Design a protein with these regions (language model features):
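Glycine-rich, charged/polar anion/phosphate-binding loops
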Residues: 57-59, 283-286, 313, 341-344
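Proline-rich intrinsically disordered, low-complexity coils
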Residues: 5, 9, 13, 31, ...
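Long, contiguous, compositionally biased segments that the model treats as domain-scale units
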Residues: 2-147
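Non-transmembrane, aqueous-exposed alpha-helical and coiled segments at domain scale
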Residues: 310, 319, 325-357, 363-366
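Active-site-facing alpha/beta catalytic cores
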Residues: 79, 85-333
């Protein structure tokens, strides 16, 4: 973990590197500082993975979610793997998300904003810095962006070259996602056929048979009215956005660019970036860094987050109260959510912050 120089958000002008003046939680202890600098320099010369206009479009869609006119679906891996990277795995993850989105769109009657935990989710926060097996104690596995999961000294040593490898895998993943979502793979009729197959071949899928049948009737009605489902861009293509935990700050800084049209700063590693429960300190490096980029942001909040802290995070990350800028991801656990969530809803709403509220059912909620 980085040390904390005497600096506060109120006295430090923001820059892509200003986070370095703050305490940075959950950072690896890179053994070779020069190798890290070289990796950062290389990343800084590589093309952006996403563009400012895309981030603004996602913010606009999330504003509809905040105002009750759309629904947010975010799904994907807890942490992506270098070892399990293939076109088939990317296609299958996208396919599942599209299937969920179609069912949700029909059931809710509103557009579904589709965000994947993909093309960058290569790092994970850890409760302990080391892991012990038998008599051996090594650095903990922090995700393939940092080290390897094999339990030996060399594999667990943080390697800055993995930052560059993560970029290239993210770029390849994004290339496929864009081709799939704009090239016909996401066609509504095809996604509906996948859902029908799921219903027919799975006992679990039979629970959704009624919804699938209703969607089928709706599509046949549209066709009967003369609507060419294949010719409508809105039924043939979809927007699909990427997201990840902006955990490893040297990587995020190196991929931050200034928009040539607006002079705004944007983190070009993903469309949406989030801050985790372990890194959301108001005076910490992660909040400092993300406060200055125009990407839509999210913060995970758990049982230790007080109403005052939630409001302070909103003030720090979205002082202009821009709808769609900030999402709060709750992770209280099913036994505590009824007691802990309402005070936060009241405090944030009372301060007139137009946030998107979403639940992470996989972390802290089992």
């Amino acid at each position: 973990m980085a040390s904390a120089p005497a600096s506060t958000p109120a006295t430090t002008p923001w820059s892509a590197a200003s986070w370095r003046q703050f305490a940075a939680a959950q950072q690896p202890q890179w053994p070779d500082a020069e190798a890290l600098k070289q990796a950062e320099a290389q990343l800084a010369t590589l093309p952006p993975l996403i563009f400012a206009g895309e981030a603004r479009r996602l913010t606009s869609q999330l504003a509809d979610v905040a105002n009750g006119r759309a629904f947010l679906l975010q799904a994907g891996d807890c942490a992506e793997s270098f070892a399990e990277f293939s076109a088939d795995s990317i296609r299958d993850k996208l396919k599942i998300i599209l299937q969920m989105a179609v069912a949700l769109t029909y059931a809710a009657g509103v557009p579904v904003v589709k965000v994947g935990r993909i093309a960058g989710q290569f790092a994970k926060p850890r409760s302990n810095a080391t892991e012990r097996i038998g008599d051996a104690e090594l650095d903990v596995f922090r995700g393939h962006m940092v080290n390897d999961d094999a339990f030996d000294v060399d594999a667990r040593r943080p390697d800055p070259l993995r930052l560059v490898a993560a970029y290239h895998q993210a770029a390849s993943t994004l290339n496929l996602l864009r081709a799939f979502t704009k090239g016909g793979f996401a066609d509504l009729s095809q996604v509906h056929q996948w859902n029908q197959q799921f219903v027919a071949s799975s006992a679990e899928g039979q629970r959704y048979e009624l919804v699938a049948s209703e969607i089928d009737r709706a599509l046949r009605f549209m066709a009967a009215c003369g609507i060419d489902l294949g010719a409508e861009d809105g039924l043939h293509q979809v927007d699909f956005w990427t997201s990840h935990d902006a955990l490893i700050l040297p990587y995020e800084e190196a991929l931050t660019r200034q928009d040539s049209l607006s002079d705004d700063w944007i983190d070009c590693s993903a469309h949406l970036l989030w801050i985790g429960e372990r890194t959301r300190q108001l005076d910490g490096a992660h909040v400092e860094f993300l406060s200055g980029v125009i990407n839509p942001l999210a913060v995970k909040i758990g049982p230790n987050c007080t109403p005052d802290e939630a409001v302070a995070l909103c003030e720090r990350l979205n002082p202009g109260r821009e709808p769609g800028r900030l999402t709060l991801i709750t992770r209280f656990g099913r036994d505590r959510v009824e007691d802990l969530l309402p005070p936060l809803l009241a405090a944030v709403g009372g301060a007139d912050h137009p946030v998107v509220w979403t639940c992470d059912p996989m972390h802290g909620n089992t």
